[in-house]
């Protein structure tokens, strides 16, 4: 299959380039905020709309700083050690989900400590909305022709312009489907049908567990980052970083279920 050659830049505002990648973050945050408000309206959990509004700034800082530093420290430290100014070039891409997740967790902890909010009540709502951003982010990765999959002989193999011109798995679309759409549906069903917000920590546990399972599985089809390659013979950095998420998620599910 031929890669649909979509310009990563949507338009320019003077010298400022508006990219699909940047837009995915902005739209993802806005849609997540809107959806979180709907959840609060329906279930009236410990978190109210004013608290959520106050947390948005913390969340944005956590996503951007955590995501960028996670990528810098985990995936390409040598480049940024030699060229530290490049750390600020977020418009070039290079964000780590695991780093962004940790950034949001730290931001949530600091916010809850300052405003005396229950930490897991907040993360349960965050967990329900994060797949929206994941879906849009992976679509943006696909448009950029980055984070593509391994070489395949399958008929749906795609030739990416920034690769070696061999047909590869469109793993960004796999991740958009499972980590975005499927995970969103799982958490929406749990939240609205099973009323999981009543069990503090359950939504957080479900998100961590299913995200980790999907990520570990899809990494089998995704090309390892060239600057890292495989770790321990055949594991990728994404798989290794997902293991603690799986353990913590399983623990939260067990702890949150009523006896």
UniProtKB/Swiss-Prot annotation:
<keyword id="KW-1133">Transmembrane helix</keyword>
<dbReference type="GO" id="GO:0008961">
    <property type="term" value="F:phosphatidylglycerol-prolipoprotein diacylglyceryl transferase activity"/>
</dbReference>
<keyword id="KW-1003">Cell membrane</keyword>
<comment type="similarity">
    <text>Belongs to the Lgt family.</text>
</comment>
<feature type="transmembrane region" description="Helical">
    <location>
        <begin position="201"/>
        <end position="221"/>
    </location>
</feature>
<feature type="transmembrane region" description="Helical">
    <location>
        <begin position="9"/>
        <end position="29"/>
    </location>
</feature>
<feature type="transmembrane region" description="Helical">
    <location>
        <begin position="55"/>
        <end position="75"/>
    </location>
</feature>
<feature type="transmembrane region" description="Helical">
    <location>
        <begin position="228"/>
        <end position="248"/>
    </location>
</feature>
<comment type="pathway">
    <text>Protein modification; lipoprotein biosynthesis (diacylglyceryl transfer).</text>
</comment>
<feature type="transmembrane region" description="Helical">
    <location>
        <begin position="117"/>
        <end position="137"/>
    </location>
</feature>
<dbReference type="InterPro" id="IPR001640">
    <property type="entry name" value="Lgt"/>
</dbReference>
<feature type="transmembrane region" description="Helical">
    <location>
        <begin position="92"/>
        <end position="112"/>
    </location>
</feature>
<keyword id="KW-0472">Membrane</keyword>
<comment type="function">
    <text>Catalyzes the transfer of the diacylglyceryl group from phosphatidylglycerol to the sulfhydryl group of the N-terminal cysteine of a prolipoprotein, the first step in the formation of mature lipoproteins.</text>
</comment>
<dbReference type="Pfam" id="PF01790">
    <property type="entry name" value="LGT"/>
</dbReference>
<dbReference type="GO" id="GO:0005886">
    <property type="term" value="C:plasma membrane"/>
</dbReference>
<keyword id="KW-0808">Transferase</keyword>
<feature type="transmembrane region" description="Helical">
    <location>
        <begin position="172"/>
        <end position="192"/>
    </location>
</feature>
<keyword id="KW-0997">Cell inner membrane</keyword>
<feature type="binding site">
    <location>
        <position position="138"/>
    </location>
    <ligand>
        <name>a 1,2-diacyl-sn-glycero-3-phospho-(1'-sn-glycerol)</name>
    </ligand>
</feature>
<protein>
    <recommendedName>
        <fullName>Phosphatidylglycerol--prolipoprotein diacylglyceryl transferase</fullName>
        <ecNumber>2.5.1.145</ecNumber>
    </recommendedName>
</protein>
<keyword id="KW-0812">Transmembrane</keyword>
<dbReference type="GO" id="GO:0042158">
    <property type="term" value="P:lipoprotein biosynthetic process"/>
</dbReference>
């Amino acid at each position: 299959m031929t890669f649909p050659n979509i310009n990563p830049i949507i338009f320019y505002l003077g010298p400022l380039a508006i990219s699909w990648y940047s837009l995915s973050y902005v739209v993802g945050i806005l849609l997540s905020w809107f959806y979180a408000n709907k959840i609060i309206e329906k279930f009236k959990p410990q978190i109210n709309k004013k608290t959520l509004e106050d947390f948005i700034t913390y969340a944005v800082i956590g996503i951007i700083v955590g995501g960028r530093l996670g990528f810098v420290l985990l995936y390409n430290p040598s480049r940024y050690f030699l060229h530290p100014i490049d750390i600020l070039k977020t418009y070039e891409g290079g964000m780590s989900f695991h780093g962004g997740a940790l950034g949001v967790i730290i931001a949530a902890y600091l916010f809850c400590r300052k405003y005396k909010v229950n930490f897991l009540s907040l993360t349960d709502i965050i967990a329900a909305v994060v797949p929206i951003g994941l879906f849009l982010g992976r679509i943006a990765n696909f448009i950029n022709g980055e984070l593509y999959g391994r070489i395949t002989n399958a008929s749906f193999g795609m030739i990416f312009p920034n690769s070696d011109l061999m047909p590869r798995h469109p793993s960004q679309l796999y991740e958009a489907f499972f980590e975005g759409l499927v995970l969103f549906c799982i958490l929406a069903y749990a939240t609205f049908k099973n009323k999981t917000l009543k069990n503090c920590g359950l939504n957080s546990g479900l998100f961590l567990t299913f995200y980790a399972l999907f990520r570990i599985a899809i990494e089998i089809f995704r090309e390892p980052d060239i600057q890292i390659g495989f770790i321990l013979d055949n594991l990728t950095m994404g798989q290794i970083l997902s293991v603690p998420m799986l353990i913590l998620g399983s623990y939260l599910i067990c702890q949150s279920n009523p006896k």
